[in-house]
């Protein structure tokens, strides 16, 4: 059996990276890792608190170290934070060490999925969260596209359908009949 390649999920907050990632890992018998959860576990603090204490720059430095470490593992499905692609180093780590899947979503759908979520530091204190999402999309969407091997819109699909599509696309990419 061929060695399993890593699968890295990128995209904005609310695109479904964690939900789809968990199901994809289960279906492929791989380990699922959420980079934000690893950061929280290692620091003993949630992302919002890290943002408050260290600012976004401090958080991004932590994130870069974690992404470098995690992308060197084998046989994982990794869900990255929405801003992980802001770092050129992270983009290099992701694109060089696995298959990058950009889970694309509209700002409208993102807003619907995140408006009640209190764990989104970039939206917490925003007067106009929808505008924040639009501004983030302008900066980040081209970066997601730059490193993506596969781009999939997530607005109208449920997670199970998305997982099956991803498995089919990866199979076709690799020509390995279901083996990553």
UniProtKB/Swiss-Prot annotation:
E.C. no: 2.7.1.71
Binding site for ATP: 14-19, 120, 157
PROSITE patterns according to UniProt: SHIKIMATE_KINASE
Pathway assigned in UniProt: Metabolic intermediate biosynthesis; chorismate biosynthesis; chorismate from D-erythrose 4-phosphate and phosphoenolpyruvate: step 5/7
Highest taxon of source: Bacteria
Binding site for substrate: 36, 60, 82, 140
UniProt KW Glycoprotein keyword: no
PANTHER family: SHIKIMATE KINASE, SHIKIMATE KINASE 1, CHLOROPLASTIC
Protein's name in the database: Shikimate kinase
Organism field: Haemophilus influenzae (strain PittEE)
Organism classification: Bacteria, Pseudomonadati, Pseudomonadota, Gammaproteobacteria, Pasteurellales
């Amino acid at each position: 059996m061929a060695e399993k390649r890593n699968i890295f999920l990128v995209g904005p907050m609310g695109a479904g990276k964690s939900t789809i990632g968990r199901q994809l890992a289960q279906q492929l018998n791989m380990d699922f890792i959420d980079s934000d959860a690893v950061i929280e576990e290692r620091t003993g603090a949630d992302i919002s608190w890290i943002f408050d204490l260290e600012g976004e720059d401090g958080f991004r430095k932590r994130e870069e170290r974690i992404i470098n470490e995690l992308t060197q593992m084998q046989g994982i499905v990794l869900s990255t934070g929405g801003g992980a692609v802001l770092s050129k180093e992270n983009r290099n780590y992701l694109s060089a060490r696995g298959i990058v899947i950009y889970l694309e979503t509209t700002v409208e759908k993102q807003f619907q999925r995140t408006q009640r979520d209190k764990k989104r530091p970039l939206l917490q204190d925003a007067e106009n969260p929808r505008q924040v999402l639009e501004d983030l999309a302008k900066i980040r969407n081209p970066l997601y596209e730059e490193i993506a091997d596969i781009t999939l819109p997530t607005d109208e699909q449920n997670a199970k359908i998305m997982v099956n599509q991803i498995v089919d696309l990866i199979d076709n990419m690799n020509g390995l009949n279901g083996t990553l």
